[in-house]
Design a protein with these regions (language model features):
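Gram-negative bacterial Sec-dependent N-terminal signal peptides
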Residues: 1-21
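Extracytoplasmic small-molecule ligand-binding "clamshell" domains
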Residues: 23, 30-99, 288-293, 303, ...
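Sec-exported extracytoplasmic/periplasmic mature domains
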Residues: 29-30, 66-74, 91-95, 132, ...
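Bilobed "Venus flytrap"/periplasmic-binding protein-like clamshell domains
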Residues: 35-44, 54-69, 103, 123-181
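Extracytoplasmic/periplasmic, Sec-exported soluble proteins
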Residues: 37, 53-58, 78-82, 87, ...
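Extended ligand-binding regions for polar small-molecule ligands
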Residues: 60-63, 67-69, 132-135, 139, ...
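Acidic, polar ligand-binding/catalytic clefts
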Residues: 63, 67, 71, 75-140, ...
Length: 339
C-alpha cells in the first residue's frame, strides 16, 4: 500500500541521515538481530500464525536479509507499523529496514530520504464493492462513500481519479487494514480502495468472499518494495542484493531444496557459482559470509517459491504472477547481473 508523502518532513529526513551515518550493519550485528518494520497485518503479506509467529510474502524478505547477515532466518524481530508511523520508525532508527507494501515514489526518495532497494510486487490501486451494490465499474461510483487509509498514496490517487472523471465521493478515513475491513463489512462505506493485491488479500478472509467484487479499473502504478534510510550504501546494498539473490535464484532454478547441493561445489553456470560463493570473492564486497546468498535462499526459497506459498494462485488470495512474473515469462521481475 502506499503511504503518502508528507512534504516538508525535514525532521524525519534529518533523523534518517544521522542514523544511517552510524553504520546499520554494525548496529544490527551488535544487537544480534534485524529489526524489520512490517504492516499491522495483511493476509498473505504479513500476518501472525496460530503460534504467534510472523509469516507472509513481505515477512520472507525480512527473514532472507536476517539469514544473509546472520545465517539464521529467525534472527529478526518485527515492528508493526501503520501508514502514518512507518516512515518515522525507519527515519529514527527504530527499525533497520521496512518491508511493508510501500510504494516507491519520487518524494519518498528525494524528500523523505529513503532508498527503495527494489520492487518485490508490481501493483496498482483498485476498488472493492459488495456485489449487491450492483456496480460493475469505478466510473459508476459518483457520490459513494469510500474507506481509505490515511497517510497513503491511495488518498492522493483517489482524489486525482475522481477529479479527472468529474465525480464526487465521501472519504471514510481509517488507519489499518483491519479497521478498513471492519468498517467496510459493517456498511460504513460503499467501497474499499487500496492496492489490488491488498483487496484480494482482504477479500480472502471474508466469510463470503464471493459476495464482493473487485472492479476492473486499476487507477495507478504502485511499485512496492523494501526500503532503507539514505546515507548507508553498504546496508542498502545488502538488502538490495538479498532481494536480487532471490530473483536470480528463481531465474536459475535454485530452490530452497537444492541450494545446498548447488553450493557444495562449482558447477557449469558461472553466475550460479558467483552467487553461491563457489567462484570469486563477491561476498567480501558487501561484508558478508561467503554463503550469505545460500542462507537467504534456504530461508524461504527463491522469489517464485515465496510468491506461490503466500499469495499465489493456489492460495486463498489467488494472485496470478502477471507483472510479477520473471522477465523471461513476460513479467517485470528482473535482477541486474551478478558479476
Amino acid at each position: 500500500m502506499k503511504t503518502s508523502v508528507f512534504f516538508g518532513t525535514l525532521a524525519a529526513a534529518g533523523l534518517a541521515a544521522g542514523v544511517a551515518a552510524a553504520g546499520t550493519l554494525d548496529d544490527v550485528k551488535a544487537k544480534g538481530f534485524l529489526q524489520c518494520g512490517v504492516s499491522t497485518g495483511v493476509a498473505g503479506f504479513a500476518f501472525t500464525d496460530a503460534s504467534g509467529e510472523w509469516d507472509g510474502f513481505d515477512i520472507a524478505v525480512c527473514r532472507a536479509v536476517a539469514a544473509a547477515v546472520f545465517g539464521d532466518a529467525k534472527a529478526v524481530k518485527f515492528t508493526p507499523t501503520t501508514g502514518k508511523t512507518r516512515f518515522t520508525a525507519l527515519a529514527s532508527g527504530e527499525i533497520d529496514m521496512l518491508a511493508r507494501n510501500t510504494t516507491w515514489t519520487f518524494s519518498r526518495d528525494a524528500d523523505l530520504k529513503f532508498t527503495f532497494v527494489g520492487v518485490n510486487y508490481y501493483d496498482g490501486q483498485g476498488f472493492m464493492v459488495p456485489k449487491a451494490l450492483g456496480v460493475s465499474s469505478a466510473t459508476e461510483l459518483d457520490g459513494a462513500t469510500i474507506c481509505i487509509q490515511t497517510g497513503t498514496t491511495t488518498e492522493l490517487n483517489l482524489a486525482d481519479y475522481f477529479r479527472a472523471n468529474n465525480m464526487k465521493y465521501e472519504p471514510v478515513p481509517i488507519e489499518t487494514n483491519a479497521e478498513s475491513q471492519s468498517k467496510y463489512l459493517a456498511g460504513a462505506c460503499d467501497v474499499y480502495t487500496t492496492d489490488a493485491s491488498g483487496l484480494a488479500a482482504t477479500r480472502s478472509t471474508f466469510e463470503a468472499p464471493g459476495d464482493h467484487v473487485l472492479l476492473p479499473e486499476i487507477i495507478s502504478k504502485e511499485p512496492l518494495g523494501p526500503l532503507v534510510r539514505h546515507g548507508d550504501d553498504e546496508w542498502g546494498d545488502i538488502v538490495r542484493w538479498t532481494l536480487n539473490a532471490l530473483i536470480i535464484a528463481e531465474e536459475k532454478g535454485i530452490t530452497a531444496a537444492n541450494v545446498g547441493d548447488l553450493a557444495a561445489a562449482a558447477g557449469g553456470d558461472p553466475e550460479i557459482n558467483r552467487l553461491l560463493g563457489t567462484e570469486g570473492e563477491y561476498s567480501s564486497m558487501i561484508g558478508l559470509d561467503a554463503k550469505w546468498a545460500v542462507n537467504a535462499i534456504a530461508a524461504g526459497g527463491n522469489f517464485g517459491e515465496i510468491f506461490e506459498k503466500h499469495i499465489g494462485v493456489n492460495t486463498a488470495i489467488g494472485l496470478a504472477r502477471g507483472l510479477n512474473a520473471q522477465w523471461t515469462q513476460g513479467g517485470l521481475i528482473y535482477s541486474p547481473p551478478f558479476r
